[in-house]
A protein has these predicted regions:
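Structured, active/binding-site neighborhoods that engage oxygen-rich ligands
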Residues: 1-237
Length: 237
C-alpha cells in the first residue's frame, strides 16, 4: 500500500484544515485538539534545530503545530518527539536525551492553550523507571498498551512512542513492536522509529526494509535526508 494514496488526516487536522478552506475560524478546533497530529509530523523539525536550543525548538514546534493543534499537550508532546530527534542527531546519549526530552515539556507546553490532559512528561518518566525491569519485548509492549495506552490522544501515543524508542533503541525493533502493539500503531511507530533513526543513522536499517519502503512509496530516503541537511544550515524562525 502506498502511504501517499490514503487519507492521512486525523480528526483534528481535518476539522481545522476544512475550516481554513471555508474561511472559518479554525481556532475553535485547534484550541481543543488533544490528538497526536502534531507529534506524528514533527520529526523533521528536530533535524533543523540544535538539541541545546530548547526555546527555539519549542517555538518552532509551536508555530508548525498551531495550524491544526494549538493545545499545551499537543505542542508539548510534539516538542518531546522533536527534542528526542534533535538530541539523537546531536550525539547525545540515550540517558542524556531522556533528560532533554523531559526538560522541554514545560518549555513547550506553555506555548499552547491549557487543557485537562495528562502530563506526557510524567508518563514518560514512569516508563523510564520501569523499562529496566523488562527483558522481553512482548511483555514491555503489553505494559505500554495497558498502562500508557496506544490511542490517538497525545498523552497516550506520544508517551507510548517515547517509551518504545527508549526501550528498543533500534528503529527496526521499534517498528516491529509498534506494528504488533495495537491501537494507533502507524503513528506511534512513525514517532518511535524517527527517534531511533536519529540515534542509529540510516544504515542501521536493513537494506531489505528501506528498499521495500522506497519502492512501494516511490521515495528516495537519502535524497530527502540531504534536503533536510541543507535546510538545517539555512533554517531560521
Amino acid at each position: 500500500m502506498n502511504g501517499f494514496e490514503i487519507n492521512l488526516l486525523g480528526p483534528s487536522s481535518k476539522a481545522s484544515l476544512l475550516a481554513h478552506s471555508r474561511g472559518e475560524d479554525y481556532t475553535k478546533y485547534t484550541k481543543l485538539s488533544l490528538t497526536n497530529g502534531a507529534g506524528m509530523r514533527i520529526a523533521p523539525v528536530g533535524c533543523l534545530v540544535d538539541w541545546n536550543d530548547s526555546e527555539k525548538l519549542a517555538e518552532t514546534v509551536a508555530r508548525v503545530s498551531i495550524v491544526t493543534h494549538g493545545t499545551d499537550v499537543a505542542i508539548g508532546g510534539a516538542a518531546m518527539v522533536a527534542q528526542a530527534v534533535a538530541s539523537g542527531i546531536g550525539g547525545r546519549s540515550w540517558e542524556e536525551a531522556a533528560e532533554d526530552v523531559l526538560r522541554i515539556w514545560n518549555v513547550a507546553r506553555a506555548k499552547g492553550e491549557p487543557t485537562w490532559a495528562a502530563s506526557v512528561a510524567e508518563r514518560f518518566r514512569l516508563a523510564l523507571s520501569v523499562m529496566k525491569d523488562f527483558d522481553d519485548d512482548e511483555k514491555f509492549s503489553r505494559w505500554v498498551y495497558d498502562i500508557l495506552g496506544t490511542g490517538t490522544m497525545t498523552s497516550e501515543s506520544v508517551s507510548a512512542a517515547l517509551a518504545v524508542a527508549f526501550y528498543c533503541r533500534s528503529a527496526e525493533r521499534a517498528a516491529i513492536m509498534c506494528a504488533n502493539m495495537g491501537g494507533d500503531t502507524d503513528t506511534i511507530g512513525a514517532m518511535a522509529c524517527a527517534i531511533c533513526g536519529a540515534f542509529e543513522g540510516f544504515d542501521a536499517l536493513p537494506e531489505s526494509r528501506s528498499s521495500f519502503l522506497e519502492t512501494t512509496n516511490a521515495l528516495d530516503f537519502r535524497a530527502m535526508a540531504a534536503e533536510i541537511a541543507r535546510a538545517r544550515t539555512t533554517f531560521h524562525l
